[in-house]
Amino acid sequence: MSSLSYCLLVTGPAYGTQQASSAYQFAQALITMGHKLNTVFFYREGVYNGNQLTSPASDEFDLVSAWQMMATEHRFSMHICIAAALRRGVIDAQQASELNLPVANLAEGFELSGLGTLAEAMLICDRVVQF
């Protein structure tokens, strides 16, 4: 079987549902099988995966850090829907400054983007999988 390129759409938070952890495990499997993961786009409640203030208990899996490490190692982009993020209090330094907010909390390796970024990713990937 030939290698395929994938885009993942994650709509569940890092904790509280299985959507994000299932997406992470799926991403691991894709990479292990030799496929290319191009983009992970976090939408709706999925934007919480990019919150650097998430602090799981010491005996819990740190999904935010896991996404960061995987993206760095395998060189794929992680986009956070800017509109969904702003509604849920996940912001980068630029947005914090523009909105006169005291702190930014977007984790390193994640980028605020519009839905156009998702549309572009869907056009270039062989497969799009939503979690």
From Swiss-Prot:
Keywords: Cytoplasm, Transferase, tRNA processing
Main location: cytoplasm
Pfam families: DsrE
GO CC, alphabetical: sulfurtransferase complex
Subcellular localization, as worded in the UniProt entry: Cytoplasm
UniProt-annotated catalytic positions: 81 (cysteine persulfide intermediate)
Keyword tRNA processing found: yes
Matches recorded under SUPFAM superfamilies: DsrEFH-like
Domain of life: Bacteria
Cystine crosslinks: none
Coiled coil: none
EC number in record: 2.8.1.-
Biological process, per Gene Ontology: tRNA wobble position uridine thiolation
Record GO terms (molecular function): sulfur carrier activity; sulfurtransferase activity
NCBIfam families: PRK00207.1 (NF001237), sulf_tusD_dsrE (TIGR03012)
PANTHER family xrefs: PROTEIN YCHN, SULFURTRANSFERASE TUSD
Family indicated by similarity: Belongs to the DsrE/TusD family.
Annotated function: Part of a sulfur-relay system required for 2-thiolation of 5-methylaminomethyl-2-thiouridine (mnm(5)s(2)U) at tRNA wobble positions. Accepts sulfur from TusA and transfers it in turn to TusE.
UniProt protein name: Sulfurtransferase TusD
Native source organism of the sequence: Photorhabdus laumondii subsp. laumondii (strain DSM 15139 / CIP 105565 / TT01)
Source species taxonomy: Bacteria, Pseudomonadati, Pseudomonadota, Gammaproteobacteria, Enterobacterales
